[in-house]
């Protein structure tokens, strides 16, 4: 597909990398010459120096021939103007990044009077991810698939847990329809077989329906989150407070900027807003941070978030949620040492790639959706079986799948099946697959040759 991007910031850079890896023709429009040269030198893309909301620049980029136009600058209005122009000039699909709460209300998004194909708000997506984690505090991460029929959660196994040394084959006997679809052990990702056992310090990725996953989550026996401290009153905090407004969670916010603290006090009069440096040890202790069920560290500085979370973990906070925008930092730190890491940039890129893959595969294959897990090392894919093929009408145990592939769920006529080796695929099924293999786009890519 021919894809035009406007804006070479963090999201734009990461998106260029993903699009090039999937063999798309990418053209980047960027006003900063140094940024443009850096990205063009890193990836096999075309670059144009200029304003993406300028008609002449869009004409130079042949926007009328592009399949998908994506506006990702730091300015919402520029993104919207650029996308409206691109659509008028002939772009088939338009995606915009919009971050301002004024443009993220339900009316604006649902009515979509400007006709965008997709509106992406990284901070709102991150807030929703944090809310999911607060709902399931024992989990490191929570994902939902197949219209939220299927949940996938990540847990750390401790030596004191009853899960330690449990064979994978025993999980269904003990917990019902749950499947361990991946294990991270000693920094390696494994798609487990039934005879493997779970070990101390394993990070396990478990999938099941909502009810079974709630029961599995509660097996860990930690208390629900009834109190939450938020450090840093930015956009993510704003959206998170809106999501949690009816939750009865006792919430406090610490913000260093007096004007922002005052704004939050006006917007959320029932909350306790503290003006101060929430990354300072004395203020954290003064505000009794150690007694909160969960702390979300959401300042604009990744390093401060990481160091603050390390301190909070040391003083006994059970659930630390840490915002990290620079994924390069995740390669330096020991991520398993952190309770839950939220990366808005990655969430936004995954959302956009999900959309793009859906458009590509509507034309060329039966892949409907994809999600990344474990910092991109695991892909969860959803296929639609449109017609009888060599994978249908035979037990799953007889399918010769490639190494690193696991069938996690089957959606059939609105019902979710968490399969055993005796289940069979049927025409019309939607198939949820977990894999370590990159660039899987067709269902036959799952089969060993």
Language-model features, listed with the residues they occupy:
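Cytosolic regulatory regions of ion transport systems
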Residues: 1-449
């Amino acid at each position: 597909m021919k894809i035009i991007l406007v804006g070479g910031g963090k999201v734009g850079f990461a998106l260029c990398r993903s699009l090039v890896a999937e063999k798309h023709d990418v053209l980047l429009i960027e006003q900063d010459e140094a940024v443009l040269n850096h990205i063009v030198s890193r990836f096999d893309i075309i670059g144009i120096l200029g304003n993406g909301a300028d008609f002449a620049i869009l004409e130079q980029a042949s926007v009328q021939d592009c399949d998908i136009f994506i506006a990702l600058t730091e300015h919402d209005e520029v993104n919207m103007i650029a996308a409206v122009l691109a659509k008028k000039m002939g772009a088939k699909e338009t995606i915009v990044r919009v971050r301002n709460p004024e443009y993220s209300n339900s009316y604006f998004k649902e009515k979509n009077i400007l006709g965008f194909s997709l509106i992406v708000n990284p901070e709102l997506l991150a807030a929703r991810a944090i809310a999911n984690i607060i709902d399931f505090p024992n989990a490191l991460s929570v994902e939902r698939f197949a219209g939220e029929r299927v949940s996938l959660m990540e847990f750390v196994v401790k030596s004191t847990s009853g899960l330690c040394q449990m064979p994978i084959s025993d999980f269904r006997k003990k917990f019902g329809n749950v499947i361990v679809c991946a294990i991270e052990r000693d920094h390696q990702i494994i798609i487990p077989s039934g005879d493997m056992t779970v070990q101390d310090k394993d990070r396990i990725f478990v999938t099941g329906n909502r009810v079974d996953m709630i029961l599995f989550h509660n097996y860990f026996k930690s208390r629900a989150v009834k109190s939450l401290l938020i450090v840093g009153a930015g956009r993510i905090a704003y959206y998170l407070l809106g999501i949690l407004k009816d939750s009865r969670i006792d919430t406090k916010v610490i913000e260093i900027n007096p004007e922002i603290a005052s704004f939050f006090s006006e917007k959320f009069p029932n909350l306790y807003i503290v003006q101060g440096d929430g990354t300072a040890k004395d203020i954290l202790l003064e505000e009794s941070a150690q007694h909160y069920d969960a702390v979300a560290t959401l300042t604009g500085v990744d390093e401060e978030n990481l160091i603050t979370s390390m301190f909070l973990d040391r003083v006994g906070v059970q659930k630390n949620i840490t915002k990290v925008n620079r994924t390069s930092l995740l390669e330096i730190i020991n991520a398993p040492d952190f309770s839950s890491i939220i990366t808005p940039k990655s969430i936004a890129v995954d959302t956009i790639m999900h959309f793009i893959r859906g458009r590509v595969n509507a034309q060329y294959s039966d892949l409907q959706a994809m999600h990344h897990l474990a910092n991109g090392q695991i892909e969860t894919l959803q296929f639609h079986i449109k017609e009888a093929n060599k994978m249908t009408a035979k037990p799953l145990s007889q399918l010769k799948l490639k190494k690193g592939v696991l069938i996690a769920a089957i959606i059939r006529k609105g019902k979710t099946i968490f399969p055993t080796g005796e289940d069979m695929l049927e025409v019309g099924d939607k198939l949820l697959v977990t894999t370590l293999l990159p660039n899987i786009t067709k269902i036959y890519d799952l089969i060993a040759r």
